[in-house]
Amino acid sequence: MDWRVLVVVGPLLIAASWAVFNIGAAAIRQLQEFRSRES
């Protein structure tokens, strides 16, 4: 594999995983809030 591919894909993967992590955390928080409001 060419090192240039890693230079381009590496930061994209880091950014994508960071976005998924943040969105996932917010979604879980909202879900818990919604469930606690229901009961």
From Swiss-Prot:
Its main location: membrane. It is a single-pass membrane protein. GO terms for cellular component: photosystem II; plasma membrane-derived thylakoid membrane. Signal peptide: none annotated. GO terms for molecular function: manganese ion binding. Pfam families: PsbY. Loosely associated component of the core of photosystem II (PSII), it is not always seen in crystals. PSII is a light-driven water plastoquinone oxidoreductase, using light energy to abstract electrons from H(2)O, generating a proton gradient subsequently used for ATP formation. One of its GO terms (biological process) is photosynthesis. PSII is composed of 1 copy each of membrane proteins PsbA, PsbB, PsbC, PsbD, PsbE, PsbF, PsbH, PsbI, PsbJ, PsbK, PsbL, PsbM, PsbT, PsbX, PsbY, PsbZ, Psb30/Ycf12, peripheral proteins PsbO, CyanoQ (PsbQ), PsbU, PsbV and a large number of cofactors. It forms dimeric complexes. This is Photosystem II reaction center protein Y.
